[in-house]
């Protein structure tokens, strides 16, 4: 149990150097491995260039739309009541929605079969923008599970 009183102040995060956007900065931080931020930045910006070449659209807009499509609305949490564990659907807080969307896009990008990470990331962004892709499938699976367990929504806390 947490012994902390009150709310924790959210950390201040600087915008990224190219677009001055905090969401991109957060995405790059999540993409980073072993503290190599410059590598993560180059992978991300190269992925945006790949998107611009392949689609001819604004890559920043494609990224934003892909992230918006990957964000979950609801999720399920386990709640134990009388020796039985129920999957209780709950609405996701905005900060957690962003974190989950970023996490899923990166996770399923890494699992793809393209040659380089920039191509994997670009392909996942383009698929997520269209409403397909593994990150969107994950979101839909969780939504379906929440719909199936709607009967237990009165067990919220």
Curated annotation (Swiss-Prot):
CDD domains: uS7_Bacteria. One of its GO terms (biological process) is translation. One of its GO terms (molecular function) is tRNA binding. GO terms for cellular component: small ribosomal subunit. Keywords: Ribonucleoprotein, Ribosomal protein, RNA-binding, rRNA-binding, tRNA-binding. InterPro entries: Ribosomal_uS7, Ribosomal_uS7_bac/org-type, Ribosomal_uS7_CS, Ribosomal_uS7_dom, Ribosomal_uS7_dom_sf. The keyword Ribosomal protein applies. The keyword RNA-binding applies. One of the primary rRNA binding proteins, it binds directly to 16S rRNA where it nucleates assembly of the head domain of the 30S subunit. Is located at the subunit interface close to the decoding center, probably blocks exit of the E-site tRNA. Part of the 30S ribosomal subunit. Contacts proteins S9 and S11. Belongs to the universal ribosomal protein uS7 family. This is Small ribosomal subunit protein uS7. It comes from Leptospira biflexa serovar Patoc (strain Patoc 1 / ATCC 23582 / Paris). The gene is rpsG.
